[in-house]
């Protein structure tokens, strides 16, 4: 973003318009990423961490692979207009090795379990961001995108 001079435009959009971050778009909102040990936009307090490969175990004890690829349940942290018509525990499609760890858990709009419980969606004012890919998440993902289009924070 800095090399292309896009930081001011992204910061302006995040401050003044409905803003949806998807996957790395969620991660870049935080202060620092372990991926490449780089600073991010620092719009939200917290960091981006890597899944701990060696410790990734499912509830049945089986080893979980990193990156996390596939469908997983998303447990909503409370009511939000972007969750309208989407069941709590609905499955969305993920492809990632890193996840956000907000400094303030009240930013968490959803959590997902994949060896560890991680924040899979965040919300604050006009910002909503997700770790999963709604564009690849069938009806639930399309519903979230439609809700975003109608959203007026």
Residue ranges and their predicted role:
Residues 11-14, 47-153:
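Amide-donor transfer/coupling interface in amidating biosynthetic enzymes
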Residues 1-68:
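Cysteine-nucleophile active-site neighborhood
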């Amino acid at each position: 973003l800095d090399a292309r001079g896009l930081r001011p435009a992204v910061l302006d959009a995040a401050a003044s318009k409905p803003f949806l971050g998807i996957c790395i778009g969620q991660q870049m909102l935080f202060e620092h990423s372990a991926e490449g040990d780089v600073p991010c936009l620092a719009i939200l307090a917290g960091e981006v961490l890597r899944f701990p490969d060696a410790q990734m175990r499912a509830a049945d004890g089986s080893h979980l692979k990193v990156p996390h690829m596939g469908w997983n349940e998303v447990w909503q942290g409370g009511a939000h207009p972007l969750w309208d018509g989407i069941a709590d525990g609905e499955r969305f499609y993920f492809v990632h090795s890193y996840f956000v760890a907000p400094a303030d858990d009240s930013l968490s709009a959803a959590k997902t379990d994949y060896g560890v419980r991680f924040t899979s969606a965040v919300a604050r004012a006009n910002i909503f961001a997700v770790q999963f890919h709604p564009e690849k998440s069938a009806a639930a993902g399309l519903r979230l995108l439609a809700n975003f289009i109608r959203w007026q924070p």
